[in-house]
Each structure stands twice: as C-alpha cells, then as structure tokens.
C-alpha cells in the first residue's frame, strides 16, 4: 500500500503543474478576479472507499445503483475515529426508490480492485427524505409519469442546519416547469418545500426552467457569495440529454438563498435566483453541426452530475464532474440507427466513445456574468482534466454526485455502479498547495501528476 504521508513530503518540491490528461480550454487566460486559478496538480488523489454493500440480483437492496446525490455532514459520526476523515455523508440510495441515507467515511485506499475497498458503515438507513413531497409534486402534474422522477442533488447548509435537496422529472416530455427545491432537518425529518428556482415566465427558452436548475447542488464560498452574489450561496444546476424542453446544451449553474425568503419559504413560490452560466439550445447542435453549439465540444449524451467551488488560499476554481461524450451524436437503437455502443445498450441518445472529465471554470468570468458584462453562455472551462487513471471504469464510469469538506479540503466524488452489483465507489481528492512527484521510490522527478499512482499502470505520461 502506498505511503500517502511520504508522498505529501515529496510535495514540498515546487514544480509547475502539468498532466498529460489535462487540456487547456479555449478560454484559458490569467484570472482577472480576486484569485489565481487551480489546476489538476492542486488536487491530491487519496483513493476510494465503497458504499454500503448491495445484494445479488434480482433482489437489489436499498443501496444498489445509488450515489447520484451526495453531501458532506460535518456534524455526522461524532464518535468516529480520528483518522483524518471526520464527519459523514448523506447519499442517495437506489435510484428507483428515491431515498437517502447517511454513511460514515472510512479512510480511502488506492487500488484498481473495487473488492479491496473498505465499506462505509450505515449511520441512518435510507428513507424518503422529502417525506412524500416528491410524490405529491409529481401527482399534481397531469403530464408527468412518476416513474421518471428522481432525487436530484443534496447539500447540507450549515448556516440553517438543514439538508437541501432537489427533485426532477428526467424525461419531462411535456416540458413542465415544476417546483424542485426543498430542505429537511439534519436528522432527515421535517421536510419543507417544494419551491421553484427562479422566476417562471412559462415561455421557452426560459433561463430558470427546471430543466436547467433541478439536479446537482453545492455551495459557493461565503466571502465570494457575500461580495458578488448578494449572499446567494446555494448553487444548483442540471444538464438533461440534448438540452431540449427547457434544458441547456452544456452544464449550468444558478445561485440562490432560500433561507432569506422564509423559514421555510411558502410552498410553491418562485425563489429569487440568478444565473451564473447556462448554454442556449440549437437543433443544429444536436445534428452534429457543432459550430452552432455554445459549449465547446458539446454532445447530447454528456452527463454532468455534481460540482464543487474550491477556495484554497489565494487560488479558486469551480469544478464540475461527469462523463463526456466524444463521438458524433445519435438517437435510436444501437446497431440500428446508431453504432453499437460500449456503454449504454438501450434506445436513446448516444455519443460514443466517452471519458470521465472534470471541468475547471474561472470564477472571475462568473463575476462578469453576474455584473452583466458577459452573457451567461459566453463562458468555457479554462481547463479540462480526465481522471481516467483514478476511476474504476475509464470508458463508461459515471462520475456523479460530489461532496466537499471545505474545512479539510476533502472532495468526495461518487462513481456510480463501480462494483459488480451496482455498488457505488466514493473517490477522494484533497486540495493541496503544492505538487508531488510520481511517488515511486526511484525519486524520478521527470513525472508529475495530480494523482497518487498505484503502480506503473497508474503512472501519468511525462509532460512535454
């Protein structure tokens, strides 16, 4: 097993960050904002642990095929060991059941074998965190099929000691613009909601349609939110396939502060929110005429599942995690209208091949959008990093929900269905101020990386 402490010691040698799997975005430039920009070299990969165990099919238990929503609870697991990973995680269970539970955080390990991972323990069993509000919202929609409704995102709000959550209709063929946000006490009781994120003009295109706002949740740094966002610290976003029916052809981000509109706000209201970025919809973009796309490299089957806004000393960045399509867009049955895919065998949108990606956005450009000097769709990641060596499935592994222990700089990222029976893996990165060498005893300083390698097969290519 690798000695992480020794790797951190090597990190005291300062070398400019570089990675063969990181590419500079077309909009990359020096930050005009209050900070410098983070790079993949500022993220130290610590390994992974496994979610609670699932049973063999067809009797999947509550935890199989979950992990699509995640948030850090700093007050969780108070009697846990002092192992450097305090707190706990609220995490979505089986996606078909729309439930959430709470697990502890065991120390991660670096391995290519999922079965070697330490299992998280269950602190609170899975329940309907919305206490029936998801079902009630769906039933009130005449064109909705409740089988298509999902738990979207989770975010613990320390300032009000509540767990915020989103719900949404992933199919939504009627483009219904329904309420999507609520919150629950930390003990997973007393659900309140549901509220709409932003104003509803009910005309498409709509900057606040729930097809853009109702999935992942995370928070902006408090000082940034106070200075630039009018104290709107809670962030949300959603990228649905193809971006149609109120969606965005690219990832989105919105800011709000529902606690300023009531404790709790009145059910059904339109919350005050502002767009930080989204991308317009063009039919030509779905038809492989990519010059029409606002988001560079957009594909209809891109999947962005979570994010984190990092502030580390004088460095800052907004990171979004997901699975990125690299091939042409196609809709239909594999082997009929579309080529036979490696990842999704069913009828629908395809953009094979795929790779896991982390998008790095510049907060200074978000400031320009909020202040009105830049359009919300006139923004690109300044850097894209593919953690293909860190994930268990570098071709089809879905990096989904993200949680952040801001005090300790620990990022938790779910890789869905990483285990044989749909078990979730939780990858852990730590934000560090310095870089480290490849971690091998040879002391070879020609190779540098933002990951902890697990052996020769984990080694990054040398920088050019």
Provide a role label for each language-model segment.
Residues 19-21:
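Serine residues within intrinsically disordered or low-complexity segments
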Residues 23-433:
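Sequence/structural signature of beta-propeller domains
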Residues 434-447:
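Extracellular carbohydrate-recognition regions
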């Amino acid at each position: 097993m690798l000695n992480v402490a020794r790797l951190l010691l090597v990190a005291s040698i300062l070398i400019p960050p570089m990675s063969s799997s990181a590419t500079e975005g077309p909009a990359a430039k020096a930050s005009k904002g209050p900070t410098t920009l983070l790079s993949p070299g500022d993220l130290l990969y610590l390994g992974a642990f496994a979610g609670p165990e699932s049973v063999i099919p067809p009797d999947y238990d509550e935890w199989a095929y979950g992990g699509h929503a995640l948030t850090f609870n700093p007050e969780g697991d108070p009697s846990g060991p002092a192992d450097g990973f305090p707190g706990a995680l609220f995490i979505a269970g089986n996606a078909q059941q729309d439930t959430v539970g709470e697990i502890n955080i065991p120390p991660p390990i670096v391995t290519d074998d999922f079965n070697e991972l330490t299992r998280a323990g269950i602190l609170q069993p899975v329940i309907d965190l919305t206490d029936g509000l998801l079902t009630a919202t769906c039933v009130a929609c005449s064109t909705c099929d409740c089988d298509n409704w999902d738990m979207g995102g989770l975010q613990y709000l320390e300032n009000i000691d509540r767990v915020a959550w989103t719900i949404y209709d992933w199919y939504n063929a009627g483009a219904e613009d329904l309420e999507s946000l609520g919150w629950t006490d930390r003990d997973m009781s007393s659900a309140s909601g549901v509220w709409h994120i932003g104003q509803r003009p009910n005309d498409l295109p709509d900057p606040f349609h729930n097809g853009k706002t109702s999935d992942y949740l995370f928070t902006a740094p408090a000082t940034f939110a106070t200075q630039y966002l009018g104290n709107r610290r809670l962030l949300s976003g959603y990228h649905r396939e193809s971006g149609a029916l109120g969606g965005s052809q690219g990832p989105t981000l919105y800011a709000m502060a529902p606690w300023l509109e009531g404790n709790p706000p009145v059910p059904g209201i339109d919350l005050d929110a502002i767009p930080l970025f989204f991308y317009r919809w063009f039919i030509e973009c779905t038809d492989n005429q990519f010059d029409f796309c606002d988001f560079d490299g957009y594909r209809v089957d891109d999947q962005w599942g979570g994010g984190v806004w990092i502030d580390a000393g004088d460095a800052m960045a907004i990171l979004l995690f997901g699975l990125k399509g690299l091939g042409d867009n196609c809709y239909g049955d594999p082997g009929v209208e579309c080529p036979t895919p490696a990842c999704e065998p069913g009828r629908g949108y395809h953009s094979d091949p795929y790779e896991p990606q982390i998008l790095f956005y510049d907060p200074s450009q978000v400031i320009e959008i909020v202040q009105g000097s830049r359009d919300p769709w006139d923004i690109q990641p300044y850097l894209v990093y593919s953690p293909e060596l860190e994930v268990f499935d570098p071709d089809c592994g879905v990096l989904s929900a993200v949680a952040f222990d801001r005090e300790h700089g620990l990022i938790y990222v779910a890789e869905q269905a990483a285990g044989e029976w749909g078990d979730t893996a939780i990858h852990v990165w730590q934000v560090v101020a310095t870089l480290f060498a490849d971690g091998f005893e040879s002391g070879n300083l020609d190779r540098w990386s933002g990951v902890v390698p697990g052996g020769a097969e984990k080694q990054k290519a040398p920088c050019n």
